[in-house]
């Protein structure tokens, strides 16, 4: 039984913007959108108890299929009752397809990834003297485990099988993630490959849904690529929206691939212009405050990113005045919360001076307290965006932030 639904509630009253609020209904609860989905890559948000994420306002968590496939293995997660039960999280869950991790590890990238290596050799893209761990062909990707060097093969079918075993409420189709530095010719070739992989994902998803009919319904979302090209982004949106394999269609869409920060809103707008209004859109890998504003106003409903927890572990914390490094000397005697307006556990109970001390002393709890703050800050920010859209004050809120 399909227990997945999406309802649009309120749209920004501006002909140039596509922002809206809504509700995603899954077998494990509702997600009020727009919403930020914290990332628990290996079925845990690093340094924070999974069950405590609900106290931070998280409505859902996202885990990574690639990492859970390698360790502990999807069959173990399946036997445990699915990724949510495995990590003691009762709310909705997402898993990504594993495509980004397989492909990015495949070229040993630094800041971005590049599959047509001969086209772009900057050391900002491909790390020097690093072994290529993956090979892409039209059928799938062969890759070497970063854990033990063993060889593996991901195809659209394998990605679906792994994600069905992981048991998340929302799963993503297997796609090829390109970069802004790939040639136009390669982008066209890759876009068609991703479209064909999407068709295969729908077929296998349908088969597995029937085969595992006693399990809660899993919603499959297609992933749009196309880099910085308007025609390719629009084509991807139209193509994936039109796919129908024996009545099986995508329940939502992921806006993926390389996104130029300077043109983020424009690129997201191209895709949301073409996507059906009644299906949710997830902007993959976006979590910086300014990018979230842009994503929301251009029609993205959910977001995920490792940035809040990753940056917290390096002593970087979000504030209403911008991101700061809590180890800076000016915080030595700052006996105020990290952010006076924040309602998180850390800001209610600890001072900036104490976190400064914890990080300088290399105490593990420093990462925990900083992660609690950062995750709550971003979750709450997107919550506030939802409230301001509903009240008609989103643009004023963005201007004042």
Language model feature labels by segment:
Residues 74-83, 312-326, 379-382:
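C-terminal helical cap(s) of enzyme catalytic domains, especially alpha/beta-barrels
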Residues 179-184, 188, 221, 251-256, ...:
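Glycine- and acidic
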Residues 1-213, 329-332:
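Non-catalytic, usually N-terminal nucleic-acid engagement modules in DNA/RNA processing proteins
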Residues 192-195, 204, 208-210, 215-338:
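Glycine-rich phosphate/ribose-binding loops and adjacent secondary-structure elements
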Residues 1-23, 31-35, 44-47, 174-182, ...:
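C-terminal extensions of enzymes
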Residues 158, 162, 166, 189-200, ...:
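A non-catalytic, amphipathic alpha-helix used as a structural packing/dimerization or gating element
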Residues 105-107, 337, 358:
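Short conserved micro-motifs at the rims of enzyme active sites and ligand-binding pockets
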Residues 29, 61, 96, 163, ...:
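Conserved, mostly hydrophobic/aromatic
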């Amino acid at each position: 039984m399909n227990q997945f639904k999406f309802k649009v509630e309120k749209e920004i009253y501006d002909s140039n913007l596509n922002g809206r609020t809504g509700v995603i209904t899954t077998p494990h609860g509702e997600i009020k959108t727009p919403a930020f989905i914290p990332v628990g890559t290996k079925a845990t948000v690093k340094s924070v108890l999974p069950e405590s994420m609900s106290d931070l306002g998280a409505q859902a968590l996202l885990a990574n299929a690639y990492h859970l496939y390698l360790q502990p293995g999807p069959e173990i997660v399946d036997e445990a009752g699915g990724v949510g039960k495995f990590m003691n999280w009762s709310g909705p869950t997402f898993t990504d397809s594993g495509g980004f991790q397989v492909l990015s590890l495949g070229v040993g990238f630094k800041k971005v990834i590049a599959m047509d290596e001969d086209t772009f050799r900057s050391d900002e893209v491909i790390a020097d003297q690093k072994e290529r761990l993956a090979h892409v062909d039209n059928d799938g990707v062969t890759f070497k485990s970063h854990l033990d060097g063993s060889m593996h093969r991901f195809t659209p079918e394998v990605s679906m099988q792994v994600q069905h075993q992981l048991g998340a409420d929302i799963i993503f189709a297997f796609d090829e993630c390109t970069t802004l530095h790939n040639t136009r010719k390669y982008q066209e070739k890759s876009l068609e490959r991703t479209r064909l992989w999407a068709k295969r994902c729908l077929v296998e998803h349908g088969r597995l849904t029937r085969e595992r009919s006693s399990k809660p319904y899993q919603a499959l979302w297609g992933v749009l690529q196309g880099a910085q090209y308007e025609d390719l982004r629009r084509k991807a949106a139209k193509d994936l929206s039109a796919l129908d394999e024996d009545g099986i269609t995508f329940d939502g869409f992921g806006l993926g691939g390389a996104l130029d920060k300077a043109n983020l809103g424009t690129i997201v707008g191209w895709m949301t212009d073409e996507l059906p209004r009644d299906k949710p859109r997830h902007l993959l890998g976006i979590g910086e405050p300014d990018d979230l504003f842009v994503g929301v106003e251009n029609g993205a409903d959910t977001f995920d990113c490792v940035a809040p927890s990753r940056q917290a572990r390096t002593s970087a914390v979000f504030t209403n005045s911008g991101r700061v490094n809590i180890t800076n000397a000016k915080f030595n005697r700052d006996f105020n919360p990290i952010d006076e307006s924040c309602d998180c556990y850390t800001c209610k109970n600890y001072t900036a001076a104490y976190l400064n001390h914890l990080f300088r002393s290399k105490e593990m709890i420093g990462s925990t307290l900083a992660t609690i703050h950062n995750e709550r800050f971003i979750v709450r920010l997107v919550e506030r965006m939802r409230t301001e859209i509903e009240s008609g004050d989103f643009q004023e809120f963005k201007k004042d932030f």
